[in-house]
Amino acid sequence: MLGSKTTAGKRAMAAVREALGVIERRHGITHSWLSEKALHTFDGFITKDNTVVGVFEAKSRAASYEDGCIKYGGVLYPTYLITSKKLENGAVWARKFNVPFFLLVNLEESGHVLSFMVSDKAGKILVDFEEKASTTQATVNGGYMTRANSFIPISQALVFDIK
């Protein structure tokens, strides 16, 4: 089942859409989401003045932004962990559409959104990251999976305070 169809998935989607809505109103952009009825390798398009200016992947976490780190479960993390395949897929789509790829992370507990410009319009990865195999939660619904994950320094994000 698609994560967006479960209670946890619906809650996360609502939270990230609300957070990105604040950024839209402040900066005159629109996040156009792909259909939730199927799996996609990125979440949608960023448009400005009816022109596509980026592709994006959006996440929402029950975490906060503190001292330049993500605070989750009482622990400060200087990096954001994401499946490496998400970065690779986003860069491919950036190249295909000739626009940058952004990773947007809503930190629900503090009212911040991290925006990483992951690749340029040619699909060239712009962020530094460490890649290693690690076991993490498989989906918003739980389960565990060992896979290649990328650890991106929080210092590479543009931080939006959306409170």
Language-model segments: residues:
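Non-catalytic C-terminal interaction segments of nucleic acid-processing enzymes
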Residues: S4-T7, V22, T47, N106-K163
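Acidic carboxylate-rich catalytic motifs and surrounding loops in phosphoryl-/glycosyl-chemistry enzymes
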Residues: W33-L39, F102-S110
